[in-house]
């Protein structure tokens, strides 16, 4: 049975069927000749594959999610005396029977899920790499640029947008003593969002932060005059960029994220 031909037929890429066939064939001391037939959308293609399989005395293994296509292949293969094995159909039917839910019958769902997963990972890695202004080059590469003084939730918001919306987010901290990176004035203003906060709220947040670190809440970092100076600098920079400003004083991360997502969707940026 050396070089037994196996046709892997799928209405998508065929990776699932290919992996299952290789795993099964690995239990036998012969090397199969696996030939993938992807993106099958019509019975004409199935009929052709059956004919070729018959002439080569080959086996057909398939993952077709649509019931009519599955039934056609099984019926026609049996009529021609060709062995055909349905890899995914019986499991779909069993799950439907157990759960009472109707399948979507959409080809390529696994591949789309994989692509979404990798987009998420890429976005998360981007958020880490370009967090807190570490590398200004990320500003021009980002989908979203967050701008704000310290403790305005730039980092957790960046991570939330990466995890849940698969957006690549860079964030830039503003302090009066350091000039903003030039890239901040080069990026499209529609991608930029200034995170505004009231002095009193920021004063409270910073004092709590210092306490959690075991430091005195009387440090300059939490001084109300210093905070006002930082906010004035923030407003000056934002006025030059002319981007949207979101008051995060009393907003949860999720709420701010939704405002940003709605804004970019309305602008049809992605």
UniProtKB/Swiss-Prot annotation:
One of its GO terms (molecular function) is protein serine/threonine kinase activity. Keywords: Kinase, Nucleotide-binding, Serine/threonine-protein kinase, Transferase. It catalyses: N(tele)-phospho-L-histidyl/L-threonyl-[pyruvate, phosphate dikinase] + ADP = N(tele)-phospho-L-histidyl/O-phospho-L-threonyl-[pyruvate, phosphate dikinase] + AMP + H(+); N(tele)-phospho-L-histidyl/O-phospho-L-threonyl-[pyruvate, phosphate dikinase] + phosphate + H(+) = N(tele)-phospho-L-histidyl/L-threonyl-[pyruvate, phosphate dikinase] + diphosphate. ADP binds at residues 148-155. InterPro entries: Kinase-pyrophosphorylase, PPDK_reg. Its EC number is 2.7.11.32, 2.7.4.27. Signal peptide: none annotated. Pfam families: Kinase-PPPase. The keyword Disulfide bond does not apply. Bifunctional serine/threonine kinase and phosphorylase involved in the regulation of the pyruvate, phosphate dikinase (PPDK) by catalyzing its phosphorylation/dephosphorylation. Belongs to the pyruvate, phosphate/water dikinase regulatory protein family. PDRP subfamily. PANTHER family: PYRUVATE, PHOSPHATE DIKINASE REGULATORY PROTEIN 1, CHLOROPLASTIC (PTHR31756:SF3). This is Putative pyruvate, phosphate dikinase regulatory protein.
């Amino acid at each position: 049975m050396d070089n037994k031909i196996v046709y892997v037929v799928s209405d998508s890429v065929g990776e699932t069927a290919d992996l299952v066939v290789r795993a099964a064939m690995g239990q036998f001391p012969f090397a199969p000749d696996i030939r993938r037939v992807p993106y099958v959308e019509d019975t004409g293609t199935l009929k052709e594959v059956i004919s070729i399989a018959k002439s080569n005395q080959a086996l057909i293994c398939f993952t077709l999610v649509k019931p009519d296509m599955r039934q056609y292949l099984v019926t026609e293969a049996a009529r021609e005396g060709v062995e055909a094995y349905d890899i995914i159909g019986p499991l779909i039917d069993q799950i439907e029977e157990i759960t009472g839910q109707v399948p979507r019958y959409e080809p390529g769902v696994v591949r789309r899920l994989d692509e979404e997963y990798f987009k998420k990972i890429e976005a998360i890695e981007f958020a880490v790499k370009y967090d807190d202004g570490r590398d200004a080059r990320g500003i021009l590469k980002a989908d979203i640029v967050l701008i704000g003084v310290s403790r305005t939730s730039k980092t957790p918001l960046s991570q939330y947008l990466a995890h849940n919306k698969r957006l690549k987010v860079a964030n830039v901290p503003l302090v009066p003593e350091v000039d903003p990176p030039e890239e901040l004035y080069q990026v499209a203003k529609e991608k930029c969002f200034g995170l505004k906060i009231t002095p009193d709220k920021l004063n409270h947040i910073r004092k709590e932060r210092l306490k959690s670190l075991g430091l005195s809440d009387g440090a300059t970092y939490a001084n109300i005059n210093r905070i006002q100076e930082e906010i004035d600098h923030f407003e000056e920079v934002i006025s030059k960029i002319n981007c949207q400003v979101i008051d995060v004083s009393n907003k949860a991360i999720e709420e701010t994220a939704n405002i940003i997502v709605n804004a970019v969707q309305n602008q049809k940026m992605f």
